[in-house]
Design a protein with these regions (language model features):
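Conserved alpha/beta-hydrolase catalytic His-Asp/Glu region
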Residues: 150-199
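Flexible "cap/lid" loop of the alpha/beta hydrolase fold
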Residues: 115-152
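Conserved alpha/beta-hydrolase "acid-adjacent" motif
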Residues: 230-235
């Protein structure tokens, strides 16, 4: 069902679940510049709460938008909340969506019942450790092919290959990593690289600013991180330590999308997170 923001951008949305009196859930996708692909997470919660998903402005099935800031994206979430008639919501953000979830919780705290920070990057120099682990997981031949594809126009088949080579290192299970990466890569939606660059440039807080933002959040925050995610868990723990009301769950044998490798454990954690807020 389409929804239009106050500045006229139509957002693709999907709603599932059961109205039970608990705060509804809004799932925030990653990227930035990708799209919602989280029906599997919604299905884990559908018997407990209403779950809303959407493609962020300029992304996936939503309208194009030249306005790409975390402030505007957080406002979009709150406009969606009001449109669907919820006083308070639980926001579940994955990857970049985790950063957006924290921004929303810090900016619209009166409307936040809880936050799930799923597979985020945390605080500090996470990039060095990430690059080192990614280099360990990719062969020289694969890396050379990725670099060759990244520097030119790509056919549809090459675009799928480019995405798979970019994403397969995110998974802890090395035997199934490429299979999962190709499944995500084959989605017939364009990556919004302009949004990726813009949000990367405008959304960067200093470590001290991130910690101050985290300290200002009063809602319970559930941090969930795959032990096999190349993004280091210590950076997420460091951020979590600055949130007054938080829990931290490190999922063994799981990578950046831990529900693929450890679905039952992720289901257990997510259900606990949405059942806690009153």
């Amino acid at each position: 069902m389409p929804f239009s923001t106050s500045d006229g951008i139509r957002l693709w949305t999907a709603t599932t679940g059961t109205a039970t009196g608990r705060p509804a859930v809004v799932i925030l996708h990653g990227g930035p510049g990708l799209w919602d692909d989280y029906a599997v997470l919604a299905a884990m919660l559908d018997d407990l709460v209403v779950v809303h998903r959407f493609d962020q402005r300029g992304c996936g099935r939503s309208d194009p938008s030249d306005v790409q800031t975390l402030t505007r994206s957080a406002r979009d979430i709150d406009e969606l909340r009001a449109y669907f008639g919820h006083e308070r919501i639980v926001v579940i953000g994955h990857s970049f969506g985790a950063t957006l979830a924290m921004t929303y919780a810090a900016s619209y705290g009166d409307h936040v019942a809880g936050v799930v920070y799923l597979g985020g990057v945390g605080v500090g120099d996470w990039r060095t450790a990430y690059d080192e682990e990614r280099a360990r997981r990719i062969t020289p031949e694969q890396d050379a092919r990725l670099q060759e594809l990244s520097g030119r126009q790509r056919t549809p088949a090459e675009e799928t290959e480019f995405r798979a080579l970019s994403w397969f290192t995110d998974h802890a299970d090395r035997e199934r990593a490429m299979e999962w990466a190709y499944a995500s890569a084959a989605v017939d939606l364009p990556i919004n690289f302009a949004a990726n660059r813009a949000l990367g440039a405008t959304g960067r807080l200093t470590p001290d600013e991130q910690k101050a933002q985290a300290a200002a959040i009063r809602a319970p925050v559930t941090f969930v991180h795959g032990a096999g995610d190349p993004r280091p868990a210590w950076a997420v723990r460091d951020l979590a330590d600055h949130v007054p009301n938080h829990t931290f769950h490190l999922i063994p044998g799981a990578g950046h999308s831990p529900w693929l490798e450890q679905p039952e454990r992720v289901r257990e954690v997510l259900r606990a997170a949405v059942m806690e807020p009153k």
